[in-house]
């Protein structure tokens, strides 16, 4: 039964093709990362959206949702996501694949590094979606993060402040992993 479910899930993933990238960005950093990810995934410009524009109709257009946020203050979600999360919680995500990414500062905010990713995960984990793009914590320096579940990040953390030299490689590796999970 377990192998049958795995095979069915793999078949469903292969059928997924329409990807929407949604980001919440105050300073522009998360938007820049979103656009890099979209480019690597061959997502057209028209399928890249600010989280503040999220609607149920827009969610229905996509099989795969790539959601990006920055982390603010004491580990808070970026403002554009508050209404976006409400939309996502009401939407039918049971047949959607969700990949999360986020920007944070592992030096100045080491105890809340990329918590925004974890907040999105917590908000969406009971919606029936399937999360893809889990990332190993190896190679990251931080004290704590709610984005770490069972020893792994539930998405891709990016630190453009202290580790910007690693951003392109991290995106490349993550996107390659996403492509395998989607195809």
Label for each model-derived stretch:
Residues 1-15:
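Single conserved hydrophobic/aromatic residue that forms the stacking wall/gate
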Residues 6, 59-60:
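A short, aliphatic-rich alpha-helical micro-motif
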Residues 18-37:
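N-terminal beta1-alpha1 ligand-phosphate binding loop
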Residues 24-28, 53, 71:
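Short, surface-exposed acidic/glycine-rich loop or hinge patches that mediate macromolecular interfaces
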Residues 32, 40, 44, 49, ...:
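FMN-binding flavodoxin-like domain, especially the glycine-rich phosphate-binding loop
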Residues 50-58:
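Short acidic low-complexity segments
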């Amino acid at each position: 039964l377990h192998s049958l479910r795995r095979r069915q899930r793999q078949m469903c993933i292969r059928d997924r093709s329409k990807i929407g990238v949604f980001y919440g960005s105050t300073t522009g950093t998360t938007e820049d990362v979103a656009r890099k990810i979209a480019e690597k995934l061959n997502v057209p410009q028209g399928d890249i959206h600010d989280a503040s524009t999220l609607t149920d109709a827009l969610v229905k257009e996509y099989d795969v949702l790539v959601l990006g946020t920055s982390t603010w203050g004491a580990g808070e979600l970026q403002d554009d996501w508050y209404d976006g999360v409400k939309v996502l919680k009401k939407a039918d995500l049971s047949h959607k694949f969700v990949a999360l990414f986020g920007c944070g500062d592992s030096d100045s905010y080491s105890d809340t590094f990329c918590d925004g990713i974890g907040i999105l995960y917590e908000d969406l984990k009971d919606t029936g979606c399937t999360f893809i793009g889990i990332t190993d914590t190896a190679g990251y320096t931080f004290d704590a993060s709610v984005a770490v579940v069972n020893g792994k990040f539930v998405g891709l953390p990016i630190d453009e402040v202290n580790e910007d030299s690693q951003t392109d490689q991290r995106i490349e590796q993550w996107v390659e992993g996403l492509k395998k999970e989607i195809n």
